[in-house]
Amino acid sequence: MALSDGFSFLCSDAIFGRRTQHLSADMNRTRIGLAVLLIGAVAVGFSYVRKQSISDSHRQTRQIILYYTLSRVDNPIIIVGDSIVEASILPRELCGHAIVNAGLDGASTTSDLGTWLIDVLDGKPVAAIVVSLGTNDALGAARSRPQFEANYRALLAQLSKATARVIVLAIPAIDALRRMTSDMQTEAMGRINDYNSALPELSKESGATFAALPPMPTPHTIDGVHLSAAGYQVWNQAVLQGASALCGSK
């Protein structure tokens, strides 16, 4: 072999070695990248499952507590609804009837609250039921008006088996605040206004009473959705005023 041929061979071998090293490094980086993506996906999935598990666990615990509460009161006024109801602070009673806050975080018109409540009551008399639902239908689910009406109508039919006095509360407006952008508010308020326009006639058809919400200050929430102290001042008044018709019939 000539000297030049030997030198060329050595150079080629060195170049091949460097290319092999680069290829190996690229493959390692690719593997690391895929591993990071996989870990990220698993972490996101675990976080979602964990949050869902916590939410389900909270609801189950709360439903058990409500079972205990409703089993020891007679002829109560029950407020059913979502986290807006659950976070509310209402008087303990109204004209001699215990007020039971039966709000469940995340509840909507598809949560089958009627079946759950009828089962818990097990035939016990109820003075009145106030229903406050619709925010979660408008936000996460983005249900159409026909879907919302059908779900709400079915719920009222179930609740009417427990009492002749069912009060349907209007859905509170949302603010453009924090994570709730102006575009998100506009889209959600379109559905909320549509729902609210359907509730008076829907209540009448179902033998229920519609309770409107007076105008709220701006802002009236702490995060765009959940009510602030100022928001609850208006909301509480509407709930109590709607249920107070019961007091005149005693």
PLM feature spans:
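N-terminal secretory targeting modules
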Residues: 2-80, 85-90, 122-124, 204, ...
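Alpha-helical cap/lid subdomain in secreted, periplasmic
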Residues: 31, 93-94, 98, 114-250
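Conserved beta-strand elements of the Class I
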Residues: 78-80, 100, 129
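Flexible, active-site-adjacent loop/turn segments at secondary-structure boundaries
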Residues: 82, 102, 220
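Active-site metal-binding loops of divalent metal-dependent hydrolases
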Residues: 83, 104, 135
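Short active-site-adjacent helix-start/loop capping segments
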Residues: 87-88, 108-110, 137-140
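A short beta-strand-loop structural module common to alpha/beta enzyme folds
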Residues: 98-111
